[in-house]
Amino acid sequence: MSLHEFDALIDRMKLAYEYAENLGQYVEAAKVLYQINDQLPDDLQLILEDLENPESAKSFLLKYNNELKSAIVNYRQRLMNF
């Protein structure tokens, strides 16, 4: 994945969080973040469960917010060092 592609992925993540915070679209936001997690290298991926329930999705967003952002920062630095 190129740095440009990764930055586009980050933009999707930010939009997902905005949906969750402003519109209460927790399930859709969690699905986007789940897809983003799949794009990360294996050693940076989080182990996540499928999310269909809005309460589970909200819990997911609150629980994994910092971990996913940290993994993203680590991967972006890897891409920059190539």
Region annotations inferred by a language model:
Residues 67-79:
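C-terminal amphipathic alpha-helix
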